């Protein structure tokens, strides 16, 4: 019994840390930037994603309703809290350490760069 308890304590002490969450920050260029901050929960199956939207320094309440993230592409759709209006659509491709692409907000497309945070 003591050997089993000792062995379990040893295994617990050498277990690697669980990297259960990650994040990305996407930002447009210009004087009135749009910034999207994503928290990505790594789970079995599809990841859980939550997002925060800042438009020219003003926080916009949003919900992430659709997303796609893999080694080569990031896609995201953010809507208002009642899910009646699309607030932002993002589509970006892997470019070295970044994801570069387009954000569409209020009918206007803008270039965006996303970084892991």
Protein language model regions, located:
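Central antiparallel beta-sheet cores of small beta-barrel/beta-sandwich binding domains
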Residues: 22-88, 100-117
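Sec-dependent N-terminal signal peptides
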Residues: 4-14
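Sec/Tat signal peptide C-region and signal peptidase I cleavage site
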Residues: 16-20
């Amino acid at each position: 019994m003591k050997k089993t308890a000792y062995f379990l304590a040893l295994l617990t002490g050498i277990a690697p840390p669980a990297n259960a969450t990650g994040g990305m920050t996407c930002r447009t260029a210009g004087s009135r930037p749009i910034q999207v901050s994503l928290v990505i929960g790594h789970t079995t199956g599809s990841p859980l994603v939550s997002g925060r939207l800042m438009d020219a320094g003003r926080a916009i309440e949003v919900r992430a309703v659709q997303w796609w993230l893999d080694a080569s592409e990031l896609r995201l759709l953010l809507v208002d809290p009642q899910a009646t209006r699309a607030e932002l659509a993002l589509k970006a491709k892997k470019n070295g350490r970044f994801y570069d692409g387009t954000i569409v907000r209020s009918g206007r497309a803008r270039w965006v760069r996303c970084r892991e945070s």
